[in-house]
Every structure is written in C-alpha cells, then in structure tokens.
Regions:
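Chalcogenol-based redox active-site neighborhoods
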Residues: 1-138
Length: 138
C-alpha cells in the first residue's frame, strides 16, 4: 500500500474510515494555554485563537524515500495523514469562504520535519509542532 507520490495521493488506496462516534460532549472543554512552534516561524497559543478554526491532529507524515515505521499500516487510522493535509490544502479556499478563520495541522514531529512537508505539499496554512507533548498532555 506504500504510495510514492506523497503530494498527489491515490485516495482509492487509503482505507475508508469507520463511522465516527458522536463527539458533541467535547464542546464543553477549553484548550489550555500552550505555545506551539509553527512552520511559519511563529509561536501559536491555540487558547487565544479567535473565530472559527480547524485544528486537525495527526500522528505523522511520511517523507519521500524514507520508510514508514514497521507495521504502520496495521494501526487503525494511521494511514492517510499526508492525504488529510492535501485535502485541507485542496479545500482551503472553500473553507475560508465558509468563514473558517484559521486552519492548523498539528503533530508531534519537529518543526524542521514539518517545514519540509509543508513546502513539498504546498500547504497554505501553518503546521504546529507538539514535540514536547505539552498539548497532548492536556
């Protein structure tokens, strides 16, 4: 299932997600203040972001010519992080027209790793690094 062209994913080879559960109970939670380094060389505190925002969180993105971790495809939901980023890229203007103020990707990879990915995939939004797991521990 390994895909070589990570900037133009073959969606037919990405496993379909299982039905999502109702997550409405999460609306009562507030994001705590944590500064996360972004690919546009700024620190972002998600607790201070105003307006409608999308934060998509993913485990990792692959890099060309580098193998994924062993058994990566066996982890439910692990496959598809790069296509997910591409989908937000491809629908960026639509989301902006729907009054989405901010879009952020977020992973535990380093900012340098993420910068390579944002440049290669031509992402029009910043990706945030939680390398120290400060956001994840909330």
């Amino acid at each position: 299932m390994n895909q070589n062209n990570l900037s133009a994913p073959d969606w037919s080879k990405i496993p379909a997600p299982k039905e999502d559960e109702d997550l409405s109970h999460l609306l009562k939670y507030k994001i705590k203040s944590v500064l996360l380094k972004s690919t546009n060389n700024q620190s972002v505190d998600l607790s201070k972001i105003k307006g409608l925002s999308i934060i998509y969180i993913y485990p990792m993105t692959g890099q060309p010519n580098k193998p994924l971790p062993e058994n990566w495809d066996n982890i439910p939901g692990a496959r598809g992080c790069t296509p997910q980023s591409c989908s937000f890229r491809d629908n960026f203007s639509i989301l902006k027209n729907l009054n989405v103020n901010n879009i952020f990707g977020l992973s535990t990879q380093t900012t340098d790793y993420q910068k390579e990915m944002t440049e290669r995939l031509h992402l029009p939004f910043p990706v945030l690094s939680d390398k120290k797991l400060e956001f994840a521990k909330q």
